[in-house]
């Protein structure tokens, strides 16, 4: 069963898509089949899965979440560094929203799915004097790692994650 999701913020389009996907899953469940929904990363972090799961459960079906490796944890592992040390704060932010305000938060920041606003993100990082690492397609064949804002391209793919740390070890 292949399900796709539109890349939009339009709530009406998204809700319609979640409903359609849920109906397809329920149809398979009613046929006595087990259904698994695979997602990149973890299904509880900025994932389409949770919206579909809520509808399926509301219709009286059981659904179990099996955790995955969140993309930002995979990014930290790939970079060979921690997300937060000792008392550092960690913020996980969808970068398609108010990025300037988010980057002013204390501590380290993970910017999820940053491609759509990459030029804005780079501009704000430069203005605020912050440094960052960026990974496109972490763990995938097309993976690319960028050390610093200056290395980052103007355009990136959907699965782009940035790690902004208060103190980046430039030797990493």
What does each model-identified segment do?
Residues 1-61, 150-152, 160, 165-170:
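Class I S-adenosyl-L-methionine
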Residues 8-11, 74-76, 94, 120, ...:
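Short, charged, surface-exposed secondary-structure boundary motifs
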Residues 11-19, 78-81, 104-108, 146-152:
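Short, surface-exposed amphipathic charged segments that create phosphate/polyanion-binding patches used
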Residues 20-24, 97-101, 120:
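Short acidic active-site motifs
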Residues 37-39, 65-68, 134-135:
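General beta-strand structural signal in soluble alpha/beta enzymes
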Residues 44-105, 153, 170:
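Class I SAM-dependent methyltransferase SAM-binding "motif I" and its flanking Rossmann-like core
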Residues 103-172:
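A contiguous loop/helix-start segment that scaffolds small-molecule binding in enzyme catalytic cores
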């Amino acid at each position: 069963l292949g399900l796709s999701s539109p890349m939009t913020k339009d709530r009406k389009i998204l809700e319609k898509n979640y409903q359609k996907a849920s109906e397809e899953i329920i149809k398979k469940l009613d046929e006595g089949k087990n259904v698994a929904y695979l997602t990149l990363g973890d299904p509880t972090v900025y994932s389409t899965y949770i919206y579909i799961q809520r509808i399926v459960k509301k219709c009286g079906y059981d659904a179990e979440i099996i955790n995955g490796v969140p993309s930002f944890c995979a990014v930290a592992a790939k970079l060979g560094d921690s997300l937060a040390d000792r008392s550092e704060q960690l913020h996980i932010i969808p970068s398609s929203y108010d990025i300037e305000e988010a980057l002013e938060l204390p501590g380290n920041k993970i910017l999820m799915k940053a491609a759509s606003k990459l030029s804005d993100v780079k501009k704000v990082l430069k203005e605020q004097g912050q440094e960052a690492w960026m990974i496109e397609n972490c763990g995938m064949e097309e993976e690319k790692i960028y050390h610093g804002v200056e290395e980052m391209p103007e355009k990136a793919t959907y699965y782009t994650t940035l790690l902004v740390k208060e103190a980046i070890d430039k030797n990493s």
